[in-house]
Amino acid sequence: FYFNTGGPGYVLSHATLRKFLSVADDAEHCSSEETTSAEDVMMAKCLRQHGITVTDTRDKLGRERFHMFMPGMQYNWDLTQKNWYTRYNADWGLKNKADCCAPDTVSFHYAKQPAMIRHLHALLYHCDPSDSLSETANHINSNFSNISS
C-alpha cells in the first residue's frame, strides 16, 4: 500500500479535493471511527477505494520532495536502522546525505519553528553558488542573525 505522508502537508488537485469531500462520509471506506492517528493513511485508503490513487512525488533520481522529518534528520538518516520508516521504504529504498532530497523539495515535516523556516528560506533562496562566499554570508547574517535550531 503506497501513500504520500501527510506530515509535511498535502497537495491535492481541485478535482481530488471535491471527490474527497463528497465521499468522506462513506463509513465503510472512509470512516474516521477507525482507531488511528494516521490521517494520511486513512485519506489515502479512502481515496483509493473511490478510484483515486496517489502519485509518486519523488524526482527521476528517486529523491523525495515531501519529507517525513526535519532537514538534518532526513539528511543524516541511518539507512541500517530497522524501524517503520525503513520498512515502509523497503521497496524503493531510502536515500540519505546528498541523495536524500530533491532540489525542488516542497516541504519538511516538523519544520514549524519560525527560526527553522527562516533558516531553510535563507539556504534555498540566498545561497547562490555564483555569489562570492562573503556576499552570501553577509546577506544571510544581516537578515537572519537570530536563527537558532
Language-model features: locations:
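Secretory-pathway lumenal glyco-enzymes, predominantly type II signal-anchor Golgi glycosyltransferases
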Residues: F1-S149
